[in-house]
């Protein structure tokens, strides 16, 4: 059973409990015809540079320098294991032993990166020249021979300070890889009728190392009913009241929402099994409202704020994308419909001349009410307006509605598409400081060249209408995560003059 504590995320806080802590072991390697001291001293300088700029929380300095020896390699692996490292940096202080250094990547259980030392001075190019620039080529060749993966930065050869920056950029990438290999997605119910866009071939989940547990929404309903009268409900209701403040416009539904939140949290604890981390793909219509007597949007937002993403409409790859965004950004994410165009009069009144975007660069991102309160400029508990057109309003209470706070965003998705291949897209942009004058959790988004991206990536490559949103620019890290996972097609919003394969050059 979930032991409840008052720990909802407040503004400015990023305490989240559903992701790993990364510890990168730095291992220096040396070719036997080069001075071992060259690699060792450069490793020490690298660690000192990292500590000075970022502290030592993310790294561990392995005392073993691998010199053309598989025995050294095994010693390094054992040392890293004892130190609790779950990620690896192979540091070429000189040319490096191409066999032993790549065997290190093979035998280490976790994501790996490779970087190398630049030469320090023109005054020390006799005994002080390391040739790591050359060694990276042989290392990459040997990695390919063994079908091994390693993150190699855009320019992997640098000074101690530059290599420290490379390792820091590897931290969120490594965190995502470690997390995915320990992730279980829990889903409830089949996708809603007439919702083929949320079709989710699960083969690619297994290829990524992700487990999935698929449940009936009847199982969920049974578990929910068993939580009626749970003694923990009042504490959660009090927390909800504190979070909502003046926006608590539907107080009568809070106890039911608290009951549902406990149901999900207890299910996670009871069903995560061998996995450490969980994401949820939840059902929210059409029968949900008539049976549960509310909509789950607000609870979805609260769990997502705790680091447990909950996607809408049983969107399994949406939940996966949200989870990746959470661990990369170490922040709350959301899942939105790429929903509607911005009216021409709104564009002319509030955007044109004030922001550097054309009308086609803009759109509205929307969902019924699943975005965390800390990511909204203002919020109120309301009812699901679209569902209430056909149902009693009291069955549709539970949305958290308001305009999404302005700021930088990354819109992205990892998806097993209609042909069961794995693909992804990433586009950086922003939420504009423009009132939406609409309902739901909603914002006016702007992405450079969105019109072309919409047509030649989202439409042409058959992506569903849901996209994950990270609050900041995280495209660089996400791109490397998808590369590391073996995703061969990662699309982005191409600038003017860079035509998509399907784009008409005469248009």
Describe each PLM feature range.
Residues 385-507:
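Extended hydrophobic packing segments that form well-structured cores
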Residues 16-52:
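N-terminal basic/disordered segments at the start of proteins
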Residues 72-85, 102-104, 263-273:
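Short, well-structured alpha-helical segments in soluble
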Residues 1-15:
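Short, Lys/Arg-enriched N-terminal segments with co-localized hydrophobic residues
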Residues 17, 21-24, 57, 116, ...:
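Cap/lid and interdomain-hinge subdomains that line or gate substrate/regulatory clefts
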Residues 237-328:
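Long, internal scaffold/assembly segments composed of regular secondary structure
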Residues 85-94, 113-115, 277-282:
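Periplasmic-binding protein-like
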Residues 304-436:
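C-terminal catalytic subdomain
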């Amino acid at each position: 059973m979930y032991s409840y504590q008052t720990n909802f995320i407040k503004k400015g806080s990023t305490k989240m409990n559903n992701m790993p802590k990364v510890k990168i072991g730095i291992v220096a390697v040396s070719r036997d015809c080069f001075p071992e001291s060259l690699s060792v001293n450069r490793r020490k300088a690298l660690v000192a540079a990292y500590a000075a700029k970022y502290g030592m929380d993310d790294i561990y300095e392995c005392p073993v320098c691998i010199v053309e020896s598989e025995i050294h390699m095994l010693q390094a692996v054992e040392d890293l294991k004892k130190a609790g490292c779950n990620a690896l940096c192979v540091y070429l202080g000189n040319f490096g032993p191409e066999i032993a250094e790549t065997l290190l990547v093979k035998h280490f259980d976790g994501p790996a990166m490779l970087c190398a030392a630049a030469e320090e001075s023109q005054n020390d190019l006799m005994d002080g020249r390391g040739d790591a620039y050359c060694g990276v080529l042989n290392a990459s060749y040997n990695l390919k021979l063994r079908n091994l993966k390693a993150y190699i930065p855009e320019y992997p050869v640098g000074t101690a300070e530059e290599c420290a920056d490379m390792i820091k950029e590897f931290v969120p990438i490594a965190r995502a890889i470690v997390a995915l290999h320990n992730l279980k997605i829990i889903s409830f119910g089949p996708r809603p009728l007439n919702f083929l866009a949320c079709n989710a071939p699960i083969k690619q989940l297994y290829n990524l190392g992700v487990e999935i547990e698929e449940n009936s929404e009847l199982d969920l309903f049974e578990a929910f009913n068993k939580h009626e009268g749970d003694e923990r409900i009042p504490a959660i209701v009090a927390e909800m009241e504190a979070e909502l403040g003046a926006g608590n416009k539907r107080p009568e539904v809070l106890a039911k929402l608290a009951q549902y939140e406990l149901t999900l949290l207890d299910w996670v604890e009871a069903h995560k099994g061998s996995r450490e981390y969980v994401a949820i793909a939840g059902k929210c219509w059409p029968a949900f409202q008539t049976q549960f007597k509310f909509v789950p949007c607000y609870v979805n937002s609260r769990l997502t704020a705790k680091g447990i993403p909950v996607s809408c409409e049983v969107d399994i790859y949406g939940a996966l994308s949200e989870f990746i965004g959470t661990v990369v950004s170490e922040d709350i994410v959301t899942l939105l419909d790429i929903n509607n165009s911005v009216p021409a009069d709104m564009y002319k009144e509030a955007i044109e001349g004030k922001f550097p975007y054309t009308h086609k660069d803009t759109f509205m991102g929307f969902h019924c009410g699943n975005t965390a309160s800390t990511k909204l400029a203002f919020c109120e508990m309301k009812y699901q307006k679209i569902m209430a057109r056909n149902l009693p309003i009291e069955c549709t209470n539970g949305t958290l509605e308001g305009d999404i706070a302005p700021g930088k965003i990354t819109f992205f998705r990892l998806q097993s598409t209609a042909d069961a291949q794995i693909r992804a897209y990433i586009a950086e942009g922003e939420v504009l400081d423009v009132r939406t004058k609409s309902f739901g959790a909603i914002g006016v988004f702007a992405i450079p060249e969105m019109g072309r991206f919409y047509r030649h990536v989202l439409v042409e490559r058959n992506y569903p209408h849901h996209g994950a949103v990270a609050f900041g620019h995280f495209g660089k890290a996400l791109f490397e995560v998808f590369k590391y996972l073996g995703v061969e097609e990662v699309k982005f919003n191409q600038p003017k003059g860079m035509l998509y394969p399907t784009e008409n050059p005469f248009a």
